[in-house]
Amino acid sequence: MRQFIAQKTFDKNGLLKLYDKDYKYLCQVLRVRQGDMLDVRLPNGELQKSTIAFIDSSARSVTLQICDVSSVGAGNVLSLEKTGEGGHINQSEKTITRGVSASEIQNENLQSENRVEYTLFQFIPKPQKLEQIVKQATECGVKNIYPIISEYTEKGSVLALEGSKKVRLEKIIKEARQQSGSPIDTKVFEPITLQKACELWEQKENALGIVLSERNEKSQSLGKILNQKEVKEICIAVGNEGGVSPKEIDLLTKKSLFCAVHFDVNILRCETAALYGIAAVQSFMQEKQ
């Protein structure tokens, strides 16, 4: 785990108590111990270094404590020599992160002055495939995911996005962010029609849209498209099983709202195409910067 996604912030004393599922995840799945260090992503997006201060197995709770005294408000200076509960903290204790930490990933992102925000218009596939797409898009740092009701979308797949499925997608996003260390607060929105999606994107400024096409007709070079102008937002539209119909390509490319791109590769599954397209665009933009 690169970071822990918290639903609330530390209190004025620099402590954060976690219960229930969070306790189970940290103590039973990750098996953290008192003194272990971990990065915590707060609701406001801030990344805070903390330590496991106290584990109460009877109450099924775990208390985290801020490591950086500068993060605690005036008059509430936190001593790292001792804690209000849980006893002694030793900052030399191990971190539970393996490899690159979330703070290192965040520093790299902050160094990029021309950071681009990514949006995915994903034509709704079968539920299991959508879960995989959401997971991979989150790991890649996509900000907004809009499920699109398309010509080839099955009615059952749209209905499946209601109720418990939405909660499951939020859980998938949280787990993907914790494992990848993504600083981006990825959101999955309610399903919308392709027409509504076009109207939404038309309102954007300094934005660019790309639709992945199975056909070579109307296709443009990805490099030329991304070199046209400086953009702050990029949207990638990806088809579901059956792809994007010619009628939908026409709607997206109308008024030059989206540019069609055909990759000269084998026919890709929709979940593969989404990851391939996101990675291709991000790689080019990173090289450009």
Q: Which role does the model predict for each range below?
A:
Residues 1-81, 85-109:
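N-terminal positively charged helical leader segments and presequences
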Residues 246-289:
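Structured adenosyl-cofactor binding patch, chiefly the S-adenosyl-L-methionine
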Residues 69, 149-153, 265:
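Short, ordered loop/turn segments at secondary-structure junctions
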Residues 143, 232, 258:
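Short acidic/polar active-site loop segments enriched in Thr and Asp
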Residues 118, 207-210, 232-238:
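Generic beta-sheet signal
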Residues 217, 241-242, 265-268:
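Short, acidic/turn-prone active-site loops that include or flank metal/cofactor-
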Residues 76-82, 88, 97, 105, ...:
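RNA substrate-binding interface of SAM-dependent RNA methyltransferases
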Residues 234-251:
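A C-terminal functional module that forms or caps the active site or interfaces directly
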